[in-house]
């Protein structure tokens, strides 16, 4: 074993999480290469992230420097063009940076931003920084309004205390029950399924003691390719009864459609949620709409908002505890349609409340349109328009389709 001098505290925790993810290296040389690749990748990512999150707050509204941040990637959904209401994902240590970049390009227009928190805001340092950024934004763009749609009541309270306009509206309301549903003709082949990207935060290793397990996984670039492939190899080596549902090309997991993901859910008896901290976790709602009971670890972020103790168990983050919880739910054998029905009752109530809020918002902004009585969002699959800030600003400025 190579000594890891100089690693302590949180860095040690991150190192252990990384090694749990990729597994033991085959040799000292391979281990060194993995660690070196990870260090280089993290350094580059941190530098890019720092630039991306700071630059939008520093640029002038007009002039040759105003478009320096035009290449930053972002996504949004246009809820209404007149009045202009935009649904925008935000997250990270400086959550308002995409609004700062897009807001400068829409400074002369009245805009309402509805923000979706992709990562929990229940973090004091992030809230404190965001409070200062909110004050800056209000002074810079007086025609704009930002409304935070919060995944938990605690998140709403913290954002409101920092000066934000916030309501409780968990983003898992956006998951489509038309796509994620029970499929009676699909036989159950796995005790559990885990839909989790390639990331140390997802703690895939906690599921390794489950006898029959399906993985749905993908990369968003959090790890260098050499480490991501090592992760895939580790999953493959666990057991002949563990399967990666994604197609693999040169050791790399390909993308599944939402319909294919739902089919994999229906091949499993239980859905897994194993991270300690993240956002509200779309897949937790996808499981429930497909009729799967859930085994979760204690978590921060809002995925437990729709949990029910009859079919959701929060277990300690230990392999044996996760396995036992899965076995308990297998024994309960709660019908899928029952889980789905009870979930949709909760979702339906909150959607009605949110539609009433949206109707009042549009009226306040000058709309003369009818009441919103049908759910106006198309589901998470394909809902977001993605592009650079420059492209998104041009798209938002297009006239209303006739």
Task: Name every feature range the model reports, one short phrase each.
Residues 317, 323, 330-391:
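A charged, aromatic-enriched C-terminal amphipathic alpha-helix characteristic of glycosyltransferases
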Residues 293-297:
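Short hydrophobic beta-strand element within catalytic cores of glycosyltransferases
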Residues 263-279:
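Acidic donor-binding loop of glycosyltransferase active sites
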